[in-house]
């Protein structure tokens, strides 16, 4: 009997998932700093070793516990989308990837699906045993299900962090053809029987005004922040928004 996956949520928003396999546990995404405590507690409760970390993408809220986990589990593997490695060093992650992933690759019971857009090498994982799709940030379920290219004031960071809004929307549409029973997103609770909600979210992103409004709005804000940063009027770097390092 297959053990169900475990959702580990920081602040109720930032998700990582422990997926039991025959040889131990696969961790999908690594949250922000402190996620290792949740991971290790769950691993002890399950009585299973952590074998690998498989990232959906390399943004700061998905890689925070990698280096700490690597010191705690010396044989741990780090799996990253082949086109999504450049951010790791910029984010201060010292651990190099063990394996680069492309669509169609297998990670235990998981099949890798290329979903570029939110980041250049974003990937999703489908567990064919139970039909769970780990979509990363192509879809966001805060405060309701939406494509990450669609801005919502309640939780705007995934949209600010989106590398290519139009490509993200196309990736979301492609996921409608995946035979899934549960959608597990990077932010917010999992959704059973998700296809109706996914279709509505994709249609909203393709509605003819919403994606354009989002793209123009985010681009305008980023441009304004960049100008203010250049003028010394704000503290910090607008680069995090421009390069899609958050969300």
Locate predicted features.
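Active-site HxH/HxHxD metal-binding segment of metal-dependent hydrolases
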Residues: 33-107, 203
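Conserved N-terminal boundary motif of the eukaryotic protein kinase catalytic domain
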Residues: 108-112
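Metallo-beta-lactamase
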Residues: 33, 114, 120-200, 204-206
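Short, charged, surface-exposed secondary-structure boundary motifs
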Residues: 87-92, 143-145, 216-218
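Residue-level marker for buried hydrophobic side chains located in beta-strands
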Residues: 26, 54, 78, 132-134, ...
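Short beta->alpha connector loops
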Residues: 11-13, 32-35, 58-61, 116-119
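Conserved beta-strand hairpin/beta-sheet module of binuclear metal-dependent hydrolase folds
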Residues: 1-45, 124-137, 141
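C-terminal regulatory/interaction regions
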Residues: 207-247
């Amino acid at each position: 009997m297959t053990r169900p996956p475990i959702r580990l949520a920081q602040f109720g928003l930032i998700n990582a998932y422990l997926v039991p396999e025959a040889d131990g546990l696969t961790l999908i995404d690594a949250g922000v700093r402190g996620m290792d405590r949740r991971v290790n507690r769950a691993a002890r409760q399950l009585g299973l070793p952590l074998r690998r970390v498989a990232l959906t993408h390399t943004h700061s809220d998905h890689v925070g516990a990698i280096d700490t986990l690597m010191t705690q589990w010396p044989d741990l593997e780090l799996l990253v989308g082949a086109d999504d490695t450049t951010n790791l060093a910029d984010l201060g992650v010292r651990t190099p990837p063990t394996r680069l992933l492309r669509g169609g690759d297998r990670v235990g019971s998981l099949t890798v699906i290329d979903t570029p857009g939110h980041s250049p090498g974003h990937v999703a994982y489908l567990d064919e045993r139970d039909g769970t799709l780990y979509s990363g940030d192509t879809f966001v379920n805060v405060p309701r299900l939406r494509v990450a290219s669609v801005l919502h004031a309640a939780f705007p960071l995934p949209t600010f962090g989106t590398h290519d809004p139009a490509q993200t929307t196309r990736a979301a549409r492609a996921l409608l053809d995946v035979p899934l029973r549960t959608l597990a997103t990077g932010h917010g609770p999992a959704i059973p029987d998700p296809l109706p909600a996914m279709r509505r979210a994709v249609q909203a992103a393709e509605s003819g005004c919403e994606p354009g409004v989002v793209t123009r709005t985010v681009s305008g804000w980023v441009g304004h922040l960049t100008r203010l940063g250049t003028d010394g009027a704000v503290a910090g770097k607008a680069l995090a928004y421009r390069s899609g390092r958050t969300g």
